[in-house]
Amino acid sequence: TLGYVPADAAKISVSLTLEYAWADGSIALLADALGKTEEAQYYREKSLNYRNLFDSRTKYFRGKNSDGSWVSPFSPDASSFYDDILGTELARPYCEGSARHWRWTAIQDTQGLLGLFGSREYFVSELNEFMENSSNDPMALDSAGGFWIGNEHNLHAPYLFNDAKRPDLTQKWVRKTLRDSFGTDSGGLAGNDDGGALSSWYVWSALGLYPAAGTDHYRIGSPNIDEACISLGNGKTLRVIAENQAEENVYVEKVTLNGERLSS
């Protein structure tokens, strides 16, 4: 097989390839848990197929044809939303967004994704620029150049700074998004909630946690609540206490669990 969905055979080929790889990574973890060693290795290798669409020259995931040629012309800001309006196909390989939106989708292999950028510093610089160009527009017609909380392909993006050893930037951008992109009026969500996706992002982020989908790991952000008590469903509870939490106190000094300091 090619190891990717060819652009000349299917629309949204990049998005499909990236999400298939993510799903394969989750299957590998399940196989590990079941003691299925061979199956785990098979799906773990498949989960790296996302790399087949990463263009080392542009540092973006791009559509690739069956013969191995890149889809051209290419613009990282060409959006499928503009295609729908204008009747063009400049962003045909991407679902509900642009190459810039889908640039961060390798949740099953974040360190591998970092490596594709060439350096941690470059990755942080590009991701930070992406966050600086955030859009709160529910229609998303101006969001192709930056982070857009209103659609699911970006939900994890601010938490990737943790993987690049810059938790301060995760904390900065999560708190900014909580403050600027959510409200209590009729326009309180910056997009379609899509089965509770945006609402759950808010709840998790307000607690200072974010689940790494397909794993039992959680990333740490910056809570905007003073205290919360969560029922774990087994007779136990998780009590979250954020000391000195305030709008101006964004950065987390330390995190402890049952009195023991967590290292990451």
Locate each region found by the language model:
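Exposed beta-strand and adjacent loop surfaces of beta-rich binding modules
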Residues: 227, 252-254
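Active-site core of glycosidic bond-cleaving carbohydrate-active enzymes
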Residues: 1-224, 228-239, 244
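Short strand-turn-strand beta-turns centered on an Asx-Gly dipeptide
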Residues: 233, 254-260
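Short, solvent-exposed S/T- and G/P-enriched segments that are highly enriched in secreted/extracellular
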Residues: 262-264
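A short beta-turn/strand-edge loop motif at beta-sheet boundaries
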Residues: 246-249
